[in-house]
Amino acid sequence: MAVPKKKTSKSKRNQRHAVWKAKAATAAQRALSIGKSVLSGRAQGFVYPVAEADDSES
């Protein structure tokens, strides 16, 4: 079984953690921005099913 030979330094651990947190913050910011544009009606790249199509089938 593969095991690390030496302990990872605190600085390397903190750097990896900071990269992970930065990626998560970027993804959260993008999701919030997309949500705001959808709610405000400014979204251009989304296609939504029309509710009237569901009513006509019944």
Curated annotation (Swiss-Prot):
UniProt GO MF annotations: structural constituent of ribosome
One CC-aspect GO term: large ribosomal subunit
GO terms for biological process, alphabetical: translation
UniProt-listed Pfam families: Ribosomal_L32p
InterPro entries: Ribosomal_bL32, Ribosomal_bL32_plant/cyanobact, Ribosomal_zn-bd
Assigned keywords, A-Z: Ribonucleoprotein, Ribosomal protein
Domain of life: Bacteria
The keyword Ribonucleoprotein is annotated on this UniProt entry: yes
Family per similarity comment: Belongs to the bacterial ribosomal protein bL32 family.
Annotated NCBIfam families: rpmF_bact
Protein name as annotated: Large ribosomal subunit protein bL32
Organism listed in the record: Synechococcus sp. (strain WH7803)
